[in-house]
């Protein structure tokens, strides 16, 4: 991990180069080295690298990253979505977070307030480039949180699998055309000034607009729909 191997005040490349020169770009070179090694050893197999650190350009080396060891509260959830969309806007398409937060409450299996948060994290993460659940020193299987939570999570896991043909097709576009799977609304609707104001809504490919719930106690919410020539169809009921 980078915080345990700081290049500051060190010299590399046979003592010829100050470590600061490569400090930020170093993670990309690590991904490049691993990618090229994987391709050399097994050229018929696609490479996939999941790395804690990254840098601009690492997408060319099949490298994905995530937002790191984060908490679980509502503000943290909101920040993850904004941060992820920011990464998409820089051209780095492979990103996710630890759904439910990496650091979780000690009573996570019985804490109904946390259960609401966990569900919302997973619902949003269903529409990320990668979907991932992880927690610090935790067993995170859905059934540990009770039947109600398990049922809801299972529904979204099933949805993720149903979306795989769409996800696979759009990921091909990411690779071949340099696009992104998840992106801010303004990237699809650049002439819509209100699209730029939507911090938490985003597009999942060209056909799905996602509006995750990012606060407690929400049963109804307003969703902004940019003007679209083809119109919009409710995903859940048509």
Regions found by a protein language model. Give the residues of each.
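Catalytic-domain carbohydrate-binding cleft regions of carbohydrate-active enzymes
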Residues: 1-238
């Amino acid at each position: 991990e980078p915080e345990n191997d700081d290049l500051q005040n060190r010299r590399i490349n046979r003592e010829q180069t100050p470590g600061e020169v490569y400090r930020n770009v170093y993670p990309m070179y690590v991904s490049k080295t691993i990618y090229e090694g994987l391709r050399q050893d097994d050229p018929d197999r696609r490479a996939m690298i999941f790395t804690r650190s990254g840098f601009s350009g690492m997408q060319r080396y099949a490298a994905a990253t995530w937002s790191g060891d984060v908490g679980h509260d509502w503000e943290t959830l909101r920040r993850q979505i904004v941060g992820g969309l920011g990464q998409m806007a820089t051209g780095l398409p492979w990103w996710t977070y630890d759904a439910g937060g990496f650091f979780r409450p000690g009573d996570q299996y019985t804490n109904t307030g946390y259960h609401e948060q966990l569900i919302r994290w997973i619902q949003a993460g269903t529409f990320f480039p990668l979907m991932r659940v992880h927690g610090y020193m935790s067993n995170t299987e859905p059934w540990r949180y009770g039947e109600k939570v398990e049922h809801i999570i299972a529904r979204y896991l099933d949805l993720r699998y149903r979306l795989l043909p769409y996800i696979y097709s759009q990921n091909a576009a990411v690779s071949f055309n340099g696009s992104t799977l998840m992106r801010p609304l303004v990237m699809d609707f650049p002439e819509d000034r209100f699209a730029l104001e939507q911090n938490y809504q985003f597009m999942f490919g060209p056909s799905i607009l996602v509006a995750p719930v990012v606060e407690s106690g929400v049963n109804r919410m307003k969703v902004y729909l940019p003007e679209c020539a083809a119109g919009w169809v409710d995903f859940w009921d048509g």
